[in-house]
Every structure is written in C-alpha cells, then in structure tokens.
Regions:
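Intracellular loop-helix junctions on the cytosolic face of multi-pass helical membrane proteins
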Residues: 183-202
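Soluble extramembrane regions of membrane proteins in the secretory/endomembrane system
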Residues: 2-7, 86-92, 147-153, 182-187
Length: 452
C-alpha cells in the first residue's frame, strides 16, 4: 500500500487546467510558426515541403487531448494512466540524491550553455526546451512527494525564479550572439539601430505604471491563492527538521556544510561583496560597455556566470528541493523520511597525511599534544597547502594561462583578481574533496577555533 495518494480528483482536475494553458500557448506558437518559420526543406523525407507549423499543430492537439483526459478522468484517480512511471522516478531519485552527480550535471549544463549558445538561443529551440520543461513539470506533479515540495508556499517563488532566470539568460545570450555576429560582419550593433530617445513623461512613466499595476495584481492573487508560510512561535524544545534558511541564504547554508561558520558566514560573503565592488577597478577590458556581447568579454562573462549559476543558483536549488530531514540528500520524488540517517566518516587532512602507511610507521601517526609547536607540526601539511594555493598559484597563473591578463592589469590588480578567483574556486574544490575523500578540514585546529 502506498504511503499517500499520488493522485486525487482535485489534482487531476487542476492538471487539466494546466495542460489547457499549455495547449493555448502552443496554439499561439502554431500561428506564429505558420507566419514566420515557413516550410521544411524538400530534401527531408516524409515532411519535406510541409509547414513547420504542422508539428506545433500536432503538439497542440496532443496537449488538448491530454487536458480533456484530465477533465474527464477524475472519477477513478487510482487507475488514471497519465502519470510518471516508477521505472522513470526511481533512477531519477537514485542519481539526484547523489551530490556528485548533481554538481557534475550542473557543471556540464553550464558548459553546454556557453558552448552551444548559438543553438539554444534560436526561437524554436528555446520554445521547445520551455515546453519540455513545462510538460516535465506537469507529469512530475502527478507524484505526491514532488508536489509537496514544489507546491510549498516558500518554494513557489524558487520555481518561478528558475524560469525567470532562464528567460533573462536567454535574452542576454540572444542579444550577445546577434551582436557578435554583427561585429564580425561589420554591421551596426543592435543597440545602435533603434536608439531614438524616449521621453520620461509620458512614455517611460506609463510603462512603469502598467508594470506596477500588473505586479500588484500578481501579488494580490498570489496572496489569495497561497497561504502565508507562517509557523508557530519558536520553541527551544522543538526544532523544524529540516531547518532551512530563507531561499536567498540557502547558498550560504550549503556552504556551512563544507566550511566553519566564521568562514562560510563571514569571510566568504565578505569576499563576494568585496569582489563585486572591485570588478570596475580591476577590469581592463572596456569593450562591451553599453551593448550586449560575449566574444569580446568571454573570460569575464564566463567567470561571472560560473559564480552565479553552479555556485549560487545550483546551491539554492539543491538546498530547496534536494536537502531534506537531517540535511540528507533526497531525490525529487523520494519520501522525506526523518529516520533516514547517513553515516559520515569525515577526516581531516592531517589524519590522511600522518596516518599514511609510510609515515605512520615512522612518526607513529598524528602528533599528540595541545602546545603550539605540536599543533603547527600536526597541521603543517594543510598550512603549506593553503599557503601554496594562495601564494604560489597567482604567479604560476600569471606566467602561464593568464599571462596576457598580468601584462595588461599590472601586478597589483592581477594579484587582487587572481586571489578573488582562487577564493571562488575553493568552494567547488572543497565540495569535491568532501564527496570524493570525506575530507572535513584542510587545516583543523579546534583548539584555536580555526578550521578551513
């Protein structure tokens, strides 16, 4: 017997409206495709010479039939067939509950986003990806556990954020790819073609007023449709499990898993803010000011997007949807079992080093003692590693892969830039070391409350 009903009549009926909206969206896209996209090449078998809109007309018809099936199939939810099968959900849960797979997937997705930008910014490709994600969302809503996570009032804005961020990223890359092509062909930039001045009053003010009214209406309907996520007064004898920070701090909360509070909660956020403020002063490339581009500022854009997507947005998604009770990893269709316990046998770098088979027989394992000299000897491998990372890497980078940047920035600006980049890289490095080797601290000095 299942632990809960995956589908009820009200859920099926609600999904019927959801698919009806998708049908209307694709009906509009069919009309747009008929006007814009033309026909398939005559060289393509079976569909050669056929309007491209025919494909979207078929998609619209399928979505309409799915919507009708939901409206007419509410009498017996147990036998309703349009749902995700277990053979699909189980592998997804298995792999998504693995942080290594999740992080590697986010890195691959980031790389594909940059490398294949000229492909996915095309209208038809982007629309196809949007529809696939919406259909996946609708099918996933047939699972009770997924629905509980996504439909939680606290998590609704996270789902909206994913689509909004994706849309804004698409807008940027679409304009950047277009301008890169214009620069190569010697044509005027997109921003230079329509640069007519617009009056603040009434043009700009009217536009802002309309946006204000629409956003106010959205917030009103949001407040009516979703209950405020208010909980009972805080109690020292009852702690929520999981106890999560607000969504905009989930990235920092995830960092607390891998670093001490002083580092994850104070130093790293301070470096992030300081780095953002330092960007105008260390940036030597004046290209790309006032217009979208990618190729002229590829390194700077990739660096920023790497910090924004894999190291921030991905951590918010991870903390929202994949972290459950006891801060364990759960799949998106998995039951959040409070009794699930995963033993963690984390060790410090000093234990790895001094217990190495060759060294342990000579020195007798990790040095014991609480005096300063013993502590420094014990943590010498980590101290040397961290010192070498921040002291030796900037010159090495400046003489090799970033030689051009050293020449154009100068020593001072380059060392500021390289150290900021090294601090940004330390988060994924520490995450991978924890997952691969169960490494807790590179430098662990609990006697001084100093751990890295």
């Amino acid at each position: 017997m299942e632990h809960n009903p995956d589908l009820t009549s009200s859920v099926i009926h609600g999904l019927g409206w959801y698919y009806l909206v998708l049908f209307l969206m694709n009906l509009w896209w069919t009309y747009r495709s008929y006007k814009v996209d033309g026909e398939f090449s005559k060289d393509i078998a079976l569909i050669g010479g056929m309007p491209v809109a025919t494909v979207w007309a078929c998609v619209s018809a399928i979505l309409m039939m799915v919507s009708v099936a939901h409206f007419t199939g509410t009498s017996s939810p147990e036998s309703f067939l349009i749902r995700l099968p277990e053979w699909f959900k189980n592998p997804v849960d298995y792999y998504f509950a693995d942080p290594v797979v999740y992080f590697a997937g986010s890195m691959l997705l980031f790389g594909a986003m940059v490398i294949y930008r000229e492909t996915w910014v095309k209208d038809t490709f982007a629309w196809t990806m949007l529809q696939l994600s919406l259909v996946f969302m609708g099918l996933s809503m047939s699972d009770y556990d997924f629905r509980q996570i996504v439909g939680k009032p606290d998590n609704v804005p996270i789902v909206a954020m994913l689509f909004i961020v994706s849309y804004l990223t698409w807008i940027y890359f679409r304009r950047a790819v277009d301008n890169d092509r214009r620069i190569e062909e010697g044509r005027p930039l997109f921003e230079q073609e329509d640069n007519e001045k617009v009056l603040v009053w009434p043009d700009l003010v009217y536009t802002e007023l309309i946006c204000m009214v629409l956003l106010t209406a959205v917030l009103v309907f949001w407040g009516i449709g979703l209950e405020a996520p208010l909980e009972e007064p805080a109690s020292s004898v009852k702690t929520p499990n999981p106890s999560k920070a607000p969504w905009y701090f989930l990235g920092l909360q995830e960092m607390l898993v891998y670093f001490d509070p002083w580092l994850a909660g104070v130093v790293l956020p301070g470096i992030i803010l300081g780095g953002l403020m330092a960007i105008p002063y260390i940036d030597f490339n004046k290209a790309g000011n006032g217009y979208y581009c990618f190729k002229e500022r590829a390194f700077a854009i990739c660096t920023f997007l790497f910090g924004f997507f894999p190291l921030w947005i991905a951590l918010i998604v991870l903390g929202t949807f994949l972290r459950g009770p006891n801060w364990n990893f759960y799949g998106i269709y998995e039951v959040w079992d409070v009794h699930k316990v995963k033993a963690a046998n984390n060790v410090n770098l000093s234990e790895f080093f001094w217990n190495w088979p060759g060294l342990s027989s000579i020195y007798g394992g990790v040095p014991k003692g609480s005096d300063m000299l013993t502590i420094l000897i014990r943590e010498a491998p980590g101290i040397l590693l961290i010192g070498g990372y921040f002291a030796a890497m900037p010159p090495v980078l400046g003489m090799t892969v970033l030689k051009k940047y050293l020449q154009r920035m100068g020593i001072l600006r380059f060392f500021v830039f390289s150290n900021l980049a090294l601090w940004m890289a330390i988060l994924p490095i520490k995450m991978l070391l924890r997952w691969a080797f169960s490494l807790k601290y590179i430098v662990g000095i609990p006697e001084w409350f100093f751990n890295i």
